Regions:
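Short aromatic-glycine-(Arg/Gly/Cys) micro-motifs in beta-strand/loop hairpins
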Residues: 1-18, 27, 33-37, 45, ...
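Short, mixed-charge low-complexity intrinsically disordered segments
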Residues: 37-100
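Short, flexible beta-strand-to-coil junctions
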Residues: 9-15, 23-24, 65-67, 79-80
């Protein structure tokens, strides 16, 4: 009997890496959202250092696209409406045991 698992990938325009494999889709989605939220805060703090001025907490917004078995979490700059290069992807896979 096949087992369903969910992989969490962190992807940029140039690289990608597997962050984990989960038995529960909701848990994988929560981790993806948490990673994106943490990265958005890092970007906000970098902006504060660059501009030497306070930057509003909601300047980078976390968005979730739920496409049936796949989920994409990404960050957009609120005013520029541009997506940030990092994306967190949750993909569903079935593991089929070897029938020997």
């Amino acid at each position: 009997m096949p087992t369903t698992v969910y992989t969490l990938l962190c992807q940029t325009d140039r690289t990608g890496q597997v962050l984990g494999v989960f038995a529960d889709r909701v848990h994988a989605a929560e981790i993806a959202h948490s990673c994106a939220t943490t990265h958005a805060e890092k970007l906000r703090r970098q902006d504060q250092q660059t501009f030497k001025a306070p930057v509003a907490a909601g300047i980078y917004q976390v968005h979730v696209e739920d496409l049936e078995s796949n989920l994409t979490v990404f960050i957009r700059h609120r005013f520029l409406d541009e997506p940030e290069s990092y994306r967190w992807l949750v993909h569903e896979f079935e593991i089929v045991p070897n029938q020997e």
